[in-house]
Amino acid sequence: IMEHVKQESAIHHTIHTHYTYDLNIKDPSNTAQVTCNYQDWNIYALEWSEDKLTFFVNGQETFSYSNLKLENEAEMKQWPFTKDSSFYLILNMGLGGDREGSWAGPIDDANLPAIMEIDWVKITKLDK
């Protein structure tokens, strides 16, 4: 749902799938950067349907990712978000790391200690 990296004034919504990560296909875009005050309480939301993932911050739509309904979906794995599949919702504060090519880069000791507080997580099934 959200990833916050290195005390930036933004969060990221990112789709991690075989299609976007392993095959490195970025069409449609698999990520969005959204400015928000990370020191405030923020409400992050995700609406998931068979056709689209829609992300929100504080009630405002900030990003969407559509199901391309590829003919070779079994191979490409662009849309693993089916009701029969399991997947992870990520709420992440990325401090950095030593892994080569790490998105967050090395850990900056000036940002330590770091705290991420989560007040609640709610999952609701929408009736159709």
What are these regions (language model features)?
Residues I1-K128:
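GH16 jelly-roll
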